[in-house]
Amino acid sequence: STAFISQYIRLLYPAILNYTNGVMITDIDMLPMNNTYYSKHIEDYDNNKFIYLRDVLIHTDNQIAMCYNVATSKTWQDIFHIHSIQDINTSLINRFKSIDFVEGTSNSCWFTDQIELYNHVQSWNERTHNFVYLNDKITGYSRLDRIHMNTHTLDETLKTKIKSGVFSDYHCLRPYSQYKNMNDMIYHTL
């Protein structure tokens, strides 16, 4: 399943990147909207930490949302035991065979990646005590959400908020082909 692979590979691929600083994962339909949110709140942590920039789902659903997690490649390796492309392939195949994944967000397996991230990070944290999650109220997290917006116009007040970095991210309207103009307008307002 291409949907399963595109979701699950985000957990594994950071482990094989040749990069010394943090690698952040997210969703493809999320648009970062201010650079302070993604850097300011993590700069005091050392490179041994796995940092979850949100505090949603962790206490209610035993999940860690894909947005936004940052750790070094070495930490991703340690959490998921991934050291090569072959390890990624093997992990993808084994995990896919162990679930009843059906395309679409209504299937319970849709959240396999977030549940797996939670379980692996919790297990790793028992050994290392290096898991950090940040509080949305303290970080000032604020999403421009597609659910609460006019899908045809971008008023001046909203443009001003976007330009001044009020929002941490934008959850893009989809499908992109239908909402291309609005998504592009928001992107170009940044």
Where are these regions (language model features)?
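Short catalytic/ligand-binding loop motif for oxyanion handling, primarily in non-cytosolic enzymes
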Residues: 32-35, 40-41, 58-65, 77-78, ...
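Glycine/small-residue-rich pyrophosphate-binding loop that anchors the diphosphate of NDP-sugar donors
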Residues: 5, 65-69, 108, 113
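Short loop segments at secondary-structure junctions
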Residues: 17-20, 72-76
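Short beta-strand-to-loop element that shapes/binds the nucleotide-sugar donor at the catalytic cleft/hinge
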Residues: 46-74
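Catalytic-loop motifs flanking and including active-site residues across diverse enzymes
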Residues: 6-10, 62, 113-117
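Catalytic core and acceptor-binding pocket of nucleotide-sugar-dependent glycosyltransferases
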Residues: 75-190
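GT-A fold catalytic core of metal-dependent nucleotide-sugar glycosyltransferases
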Residues: 6-54
